[in-house]
Amino acid sequence: MSLAFDINYRPKAPWFGGDLQTMSAVLSPPKVALDDADIEDLRIPADDGTEDVLLGQRLVRRGSDGPRQETTVVLLHGLLGDFDRDYMRLLTRHYLDHGYIVVRMNLRGAGSSRLLCTRNYHAGFTQDLTVIAQALSAREDTGRLAWIGISLSGNMLLKAASETPFVEAADQAAIVSISAPFDLQATATRFSRRRNFLYSRYLVNKIRKQMPLQPGLRPDQVEHLKRIKTIGEFDEHFTAPDHGYGSADEYYIENSAKRFVLDARLPCLAIVAANDPWIDDRPYRAIEWSKNPLLTPAICRTGGHVGFHAQGHRQPIYTAWSRSFFEASSKPATPTPSRR
């Protein structure tokens, strides 16, 4: 797909540097109203033998003759987020204004789904994406699916793009990842750096607040949670064993999207910033993207983590870029990509 994105765009004042781009939503929270949309609550049962339920919303802008686009945009949030985070609302608003149906989902155990789930999502938990795709594709009012994954869910989508169950369920979908932790080990290593101490502490504190609310958490696990100091320790003692991995390293190796992306069978746009304080861009640069014509990398000079505020753009540039990508990605052939 021949699309050109201005990866050397100038940052919009005052968001100069990766840290300010990253913290922009905290320092200047966007005010996004969605009160002109008809909202349908979604409940999608998991298919893994649990009674877990995935919760989401389907939104259509009110006051028109229905959606102008025959596409449903599915939005997935990042680590410790939910479907009502600021970036989710921004994307919802953008796509509603351009005539799309929007589905925004909570990942397993996130947000309002927390009390209905005994398991949690993780960076490679793609079976739930297949379940979501199957549920939406079964509806006559869905049309084509277009997926946007923010941060952790971006890794999930880039991994799922090579997996037959998801590819068949999503049927001619397209995928955009934004600030995905493409190499989970590299991301954990970056978080352990001294310069990222405040970010790490912020996320660990959120984990400590959210995890005790999870059904089935034992008292000894709650006590152990109080001693966790880094994301790596959390993955070692909770994420990995909870999902059958022997260690955090095994979990990282088995679920990093960089292992799978060259085998993608759906069009994928991967947006990341070189000055993202959380995500190392070097694993992105190490991939020979041209080996698979379905892949489009956008490794930007600036943008931070899920920031991407550019001069001349009212909204983060990933809103317009993702829409351009979806519009350009008509039904492609499904080639067998060459291996590394």
What are the functions of these language-model segments?
Residues G18-D65, H309-G312:
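N-terminal cap/lid segment of alpha/beta-hydrolase-fold proteins
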Residues Q69-G78:
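Short beta-strand element of the alpha/beta-hydrolase
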Residues G81-D84, T92, L96-L116:
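Conserved alpha/beta-hydrolase
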Residues H94, R108-A146:
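Catalytic nucleophile-loop/oxyanion-hole region of alpha/beta-hydrolase
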Residues A138-D242:
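Alpha/beta-hydrolase-fold enzymes
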Residues A264, A270-V272, D276:
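Short beta-strand/loop motif that positions the catalytic acidic residue
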Residues S290-V306:
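Catalytic histidine neighborhood in serine/cysteine hydrolases
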Residues G303-P316:
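Catalytic histidine-centered segment of alpha/beta-hydrolase-like enzymes
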